[in-house]
Amino acid sequence: MTISNTRPITPDLIASHGLKPDEYERILNLIGREPTFTELGIFSAMWNEHCSYKSSKKWLRTLPTKGPRVIQGPGENAGVVDIDDGDCVVFKMESHNHPSYIEPYQGAATGVGGILRDVFTMGARPVAAMNALRFGSPDHPKTRHLVSGVVAGVGGYGNSFGVPTVGGEVEFDARYNGNILVNAFAAGLAKTDAIFYSKAEGVGLPVVYLGAKTGRDGVGGATMASAEFDESIEEKRPTVQVGDPFTEKCLLEACLELMQTGAVIAIQDMGAAGLTCSAVEMGAKGDLGIELDLDKVPVREERMTAYEMMLSESQERMLMVLRPEKEEEAKAIFVKWGLDFAIVGKTTDDLRFRILHQGEEVANLPIKELGDEAPEYDRPWTPARAPSPLATNDVPQADVSDALLKLVGSANNSSRRWVYEQYDTLIQGNSLQLPGGDAGVIRVEGHETKALAFSSDVTPRYVEADPFEGGKQAVAECWRNLTATGALPLAATDNLNFGNPERPEIMSQLVHAIKGIGEACQALDFPIVSGNVSLYNETNGQAILPTPTIGGVGLVRDWSKMARIRFAAANETILLAGAPESWGTHIGQSVYMRDIHGRTDGPAPHVDLGHERKVGDFVRGLIEDGLVTAVHDCSSGGLALAVAEMAIASGIGATIDAPAEHDPIPVFYGEDQGRYVVTVAEGSAETVAARAKAAGVALPVIGRTGGNAVQLGDARPVSVDELRSAHEAWFPNYMGGDLAPDN
């Protein structure tokens, strides 16, 4: 259906574009007339939450974004961090939540495609991907279908494009029943003197369209991603984009080849709001106007309107400002790769965004007010309310070994092998640590010893209980996971997934989580260099668990000394770095309370950032000096799960003592922060103990490796085979449909 640009602008039409009455008034005051239909669509796309961050911008500004290694912080397609020797890592994490719920395969696939494009737009070749996935309860009728589609979509795109998936998360909770989360991360490598930016410079220069043709897929996608779901969800299926990883691979190679010619002045990928957003961002950043002639845009469907072309989110497309003398050379590269190359406009000096179609001017708007001067809100938020502590004697009991078996085989703590074996984890030939450990690690090509570590973390149940502590914990756990491989954590990207910010209690979650993230990043020298905010993750008024995912990158100076989680040998000493006197104390919000006793009460664990840093720096020093043989951070499931995972990974058992006079439940299942399980060979034990004493780090000996079972204190031993069977069984059984879902 062709929609006229002179369609009457009614209150219903304004509301259907996600614009509030006061925002429409602002448009009228800004342009001094009623907008055309195309202009209304452009404002809707640029002023929605997905593109403008209007509810979160005030708080995002408070995050630490600078550091000695930060070359580019937030505001570009991705963050850029120096990794020495003239190399840099370019990375970002972004959500594709709403599309993935409506159309799981394409939603997840184009989420991967979009984040890869953000990275190579900056001039970097993608070298690693991660995906943090959150689904509804296993017994919800849609969950299995969504898991299957999303995992296939992530694998289908990443594998075909040729980037290894090195890590991620998969979690289930009934609060995601109506809104799943698909947070995609990508990282690439570039030279520090060859980074490309999106800021247009120079007047009268050609604006070039690159890549695939424009269709009607994804029209209105960014607006959909800024609204809650309701009963009309199926009608939103046409707003999901369709991806082609092979075209994207060609686009990558063509862009990197073009960048070597010196032809590129500015480049921006077409993501949310397509041609509109990319053109506005390039012009607004450079204080330039942009004029586009839509008759020149390569299309794959007939009779497309200006509105559809401006708002299409067809994939695998770029916009570029080009040096005119390089036009023929640039065109030849794209023709060689079988891609479209079309000059569709020019830069101007009047700060206007002008759109021509079939000889008519269909839009003429002020570019700055569309872009970096979009509306910004200081939404009301309620004060923080931390839950009361559990009573001292409120420690529900269970058999320690039964609990261990149940937790290692539970929906949220079982092996994710079923997921990551559908991803190519080895392509490019640089993978050193695959999913299943604390962090994924890849070698930096062309360098003998250097590697990069990647981790993605958040504990939503902590954030719901206490957004400030939960925000701190997400950063601390990511930093800890990188450290556990021996990496120096460099910087992070944040993907903030929350409900409707117009509700003060939800806005409060967002505000306090950002405050916690900021405090932790500051204390740990772990700046935020890129990110994404996804709000309105609600269905019929039911919000998701607040989920501020943190993706982090660390530098391993010598990968031959890198630590892994698996026990290296029998008869080694097991130590607990950073342990409190009783080894573990905090069971509020623990998986033990949730999965064994069905309780979600109590406070989140406190994160002492000074302690976190001291213990982490100490452990990293041990790894770099070759003094430890295995390392695993203590997080979900506490000491018990950490030891069990180390045993499962190695096939070697462990005997863990228990401190006298202490209840074994918090000792083994407490989720106190800032702890690492480490093993040392006989010859290193005294050296390590002396270093711990000098550093002021608690490092009690808690047991020994060996045998074929895990024994926790006085509890009955559980064989490693039994633990592995339980750990590996849940996911394939569930996806095969022959498992009680809550097992």
Curated annotation (Swiss-Prot):
UniProt xrefs under InterPro entries: PRibForGlyAmidine_synth_PurL, PurL_linker, PurM-like_C_dom, PurM-like_C_sf, PurM-like_N, PurM-like_N_sf
Gene Ontology BP annotations: 'de novo' IMP biosynthetic process
Annotated binding of ATP, by residue: Y53, K92, D494, G531
Catalytic activity: N(2)-formyl-N(1)-(5-phospho-beta-D-ribosyl)glycinamide + L-glutamine + ATP + H2O = 2-formamido-N(1)-(5-O-phospho-beta-D-ribosyl)acetamidine + L-glutamate + ADP + phosphate + H(+)
Class of this enzyme: ligase
Protein name: Phosphoribosylformylglycinamidine synthase subunit PurL
Pfam families in the record: AIRS, AIRS_C, FGAR-AT_linker
One function term, GO molecular function aspect: ATP binding
Function statement: Part of the phosphoribosylformylglycinamidine synthase complex involved in the purines biosynthetic pathway. Catalyzes the ATP-dependent conversion of formylglycinamide ribonucleotide (FGAR) and glutamine to yield formylglycinamidine ribonucleotide (FGAM) and glutamate. The FGAM synthase complex is composed of three subunits. PurQ produces an ammonia molecule by converting glutamine to glutamate. PurL transfers the ammonia molecule to FGAR to form FGAM in an ATP-dependent manner.
Family membership: Belongs to the FGAMS family.
Compartments, as annotated in UniProt: Cytoplasm
Classification via NCBIfam families: FGAM_synth_II, PRK01213.1
Main subcellular localisation: cytoplasm
Associated pathway: Purine metabolism; IMP biosynthesis via de novo pathway; 5-amino-1-(5-phospho-D-ribosyl)imidazole from N(2)-formyl-N(1)-(5-phospho-D-ribosyl)glycinamide: step 1/2
Residues binding Mg(2+) 1: E94, N532
One Gene Ontology CC term in the entry: cytoplasm
Origin superkingdom: Bacteria
Location of the active site: H50, H96
Binding positions (substrate): S95, H96, N97, H98, R117, Q241, E313, S314, Q315, S534
Keywords of this entry: ATP-binding, Cytoplasm, Ligase, Magnesium, Metal-binding, Nucleotide-binding, Purine biosynthesis
Subunit relationships: Monomer. Part of the FGAM synthase complex composed of 1 PurL, 1 PurQ and 2 PurS subunits.
HAMAP family linked: PurL_2
Chain positions recorded as Mg(2+) 2 binding sites: D118, D269
Listed EC numbers: 6.3.5.3
